[in-house]
Amino acid sequence: MINLKIGQKLQLEIERMGINGEGIGVISGRLVFIPYALPGEEVLVEITENARNFSRAKLVKIIEKSPNRVKPQDRAYHEMSQSHIMHLSYPMQLEFKRDVMRQALEKYKPAGWRNYELRATLGMENTLGYRNKLQFQVRRLNDGTVIAGLYQEGTHHLVNLDNCLVQDPKTQEIINHICRLIEKFDLPVYDERKIGGIRTVMVRRSQKTGEVQIIFVTSTPIILDGQVWPELREEPSKRQKNSFVKFDKMLSALTEEFEEIVTVAVNFHPRKTSEIYGERTQILFNEKETITEGVLDYEFELSPRAFYQLNSEQANVLYGEAVKALNPKKDDRVIDAYCGVGTIGFAVAKKVKSVHGMDITPESIFDARENAKRLGLKNCHYEIGKAERIIPNWNKSGHRATAMIVDPPRTGLDDALLETITKFPPEKMVYVSCNVSTLAKDLVVLANFYKVEYIQSVDMFPHTARTEAVVKLTKRDEPLKIVKFEHLEEERKAEAFAKGKKRGRRPQKYGKY
């Protein structure tokens, strides 16, 4: 195998795209990953990193351009994330996202994977302005200018996103105005080295009603109407007081400028961690404590901290596909794991005997219960906690599920939940995935107990390498093999350790597109 040196320039042809959207070329049997390069292109690249089995390079020049290459519309495109694919025509983005699923299956090889039906990705007509929520870090530059945006991938460089084209225009307008108000009222802004103040701002807008809710995350207490929150146990020093965020003028100016704002909250997060939120949240302004959103044929309420899909338009497509895959029957007893505010469960509640959901976020379960009441769904029951703890209790109390919906975070299903599912397998199951790699990994276990009927890819995030998928699973008459979960857990821990050791750093939890 050829030895490549850092800084070495070479010419190669791009053969395919990798799971993160990068182009992949091969030189003397060695894989080279090049962000922003497309299949079929002849490119000049410069080697930036060498690992044992592959190299990474940056694109220097496109010698022969792909007919599928288009000019990115977003001026901050190359700074935001190397997994963006705005340079690829949209029809080919959809095909790429189906291929990403194929690559993940080929890597993990769950039982029968070659015969899985991979359906064409369901895309959008308008691929800009689709993100209903932003969660931007805030920083003050040396000249006093306040910017808001996201960290450049793998760095602590904050990219100023003052005109992000995939963001809902109203949320973008509001965050830009917030930055100007912070400057105007000289409010303290967080600096991870020495200064406390505002560190993150979340703005979410309902696509159904236009209502807006905002969360300010601060590392220091706030002052509103002369009151300090959170309450302090001892008198603060003068230096500490100077870092307190005086919210009176900001709150008045913001709510007067934007009549769409119905909720403003503050979250106190004093610790120096990469977690976005702290444990305590206080409502500052509440014309309404929730916003009203809609999906399929019903409406529901969302608290500021509750989870909901970032793309409201495609959420209709995603949840519609989930309902279709479940094929609900009147005698079905459904478990909605990772239920959030209950959105998928509500879509089937009137067609089944019962829906039992759980989530670890208290705000989400509160919203789920209130939404169920408002919708008149008396057959819905929700609990706070982990599925692997709650499901066995439900089984003991007589609620043995015949159908299950899982919609886990990007980390996939917890091993304990996988074990619980295999001990109490429902007759049918729908897996809604936001990470094809962890989906394929989970199918290694699930495919022993369930037949994969099909996988339907849904494009929730146009112009990024991310995709979501709905998997229809039907219980097998007999398991293909018995899975030893103690070995599975050891293997995954070893894999995670090796990945972390190879990267040489802890993964960033700050948001990126």
From Swiss-Prot:
InterPro entries given in the database record: MeTrfase_TrmA_AS, MeTrfase_TrmA_CS, NA-bd_OB-fold, SAM-dependent_MTases_sf, TRAM_dom, U5_MeTrfase_fam
Entry keyword set: Methyltransferase, S-adenosyl-L-methionine, Transferase
Active site (UniProt): 434 (nucleophile)
EC identifiers of the protein: 2.1.1.-
Domain TRAM: 3-61
Keyword Methyltransferase: yes
GO biological process, one term: rRNA base methylation
GO molecular function list: rRNA (uridine-C5-)-methyltransferase activity
Residues annotated to bind S-adenosyl-L-methionine: 309, 338, 359, 407
Family: Belongs to the class I-like SAM-binding methyltransferase superfamily. RNA M5U methyltransferase family.
PANTHER family, A to Z: PTHR11061:SF45, RNA M5U METHYLTRANSFERASE
Name recorded for this polypeptide: Uncharacterized RNA methyltransferase YwfF
Organism ancestry: Bacteria, Bacillati, Bacillota, Bacilli, Lactobacillales
